[in-house]
Amino acid sequence: MVLERLRRGGEPEDPRYAALSPQERRILKGIADGLTNRQIGAELYLAEKTVKNYVSSLLHKLGFTRRTEAAVYAAERRHTERP
């Protein structure tokens, strides 16, 4: 945890993002990449309905109602994260 903060320059991690499971984070990345549920499912070897369930869960955890809000959030995270 401390090493992760140092890698990010000492800034605290967003607790909403920290609450996401690794699979939800992968799906969030797919959303940010502009992929459909079907495309995300094909990439992650999941059924489209399963992806839809994950999307609903991650939207709830992030406090969003729209997929586009999640895409903007993920894009902003990418922009502010350090390599």
Protein language model annotation of sequence segments:
Residues 1-18, 22, 26, 78-79:
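Short, flexible helix-to-coil linker/hinge segments that flank and couple to helix-turn-helix
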Residues 15-22, 30, 45-49, 53:
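Residues at secondary-structure transition points
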Residues 32-35, 75-78:
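Short helix-capping/turn signature of helix-turn-helix
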Residues 34-69:
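Recognition helix of helix-turn-helix DNA-binding domains
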Residues 43, 72-77:
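Charged/polar positions on well-ordered alpha helices
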Residues 81-83:
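Actinobacteria-biased recognition of intrinsically disordered, low-complexity terminal regions
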